[in-house]
Amino acid sequence: MGVFRTRFTETFGVEHPIMQGGMQWVGRAEMAAAVANAGGLATLSALTQPSPEALAAEIARCRELTDRPFGVNLTLLPTQKPVPYAEYRAAIIETGIRVVETAGNDPGEHIAEFRRHGVKVIHKCTAVRHALKAERLGVDAVSIDGFECAGHPGEDDIPGLVLLPAAANRLRVPIIASGGFADGRGLVAALALGRSEERRVGK
C-alpha cells in the first residue's frame, strides 16, 4: 500500500496517486510496464501502433512484463488520413483493458461505448469548460493539463497553478494534475491544490 490513499488510487487500483499519461512514440510496453510495476497508473499510446491489430499485440506484450493495472491512451485528432478510431476502440475493449485515457476532440461516442463495456475513462482537458463537459458525459476522472504540459497544451496558455484550483472548485470527479510535475515536490503541490493525484511528466 502506498503512502497516499486517494480516490484515484482506489478507483483505478494502483498503489500511488501518479499516472503516466499517453506519449506518442514513447508510450510502449516497456515504459508502461515499468510505471505499473512501480505502482503508478501506466498507459500505452494507441496511435503509436500502426493498426488496431498492432495495438492488441502491444497490450499482450505489456501483460508479459507486468501483472499490474495499466491503461491505453486514445487521442482523437483531426488528420488528413482518417484514423480507424472505432477499430482501435474495439481492440481496447476486446483485449480486456479496464482503463482508457481519451484526449483531443469530442470523446462522447467513445466514452459511452467504453463505459458500456465496463471500462473506466479519464479524459484529458486543458480548460475547465472541457472538464465539466467530460464530467457530464460520465468520465471517471479528468486530467487537467496546464500550459506546462508536453504535447497539446490547449489554446488558453493557463498554467496549472491557476487552472487546477479553478477546476477543483467545480468538479466532483477525481482530478489528475498534469504538466510540469516531475518529483515528490510536485506531488505535494498537487495535494496542496486540494487534489490528490498528479501526472508525472519528465525525467
Locations of the language-model features?
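Glycine-rich beta-to-alpha active-site loop
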Residues: 124, 174-192, 197
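Conserved small/polar residues in nucleotide/adenosyl-binding loops
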Residues: 198-203
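Active-site entrance/lid segments in N-terminal catalytic domains of soluble metabolic enzymes
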Residues: 1-174
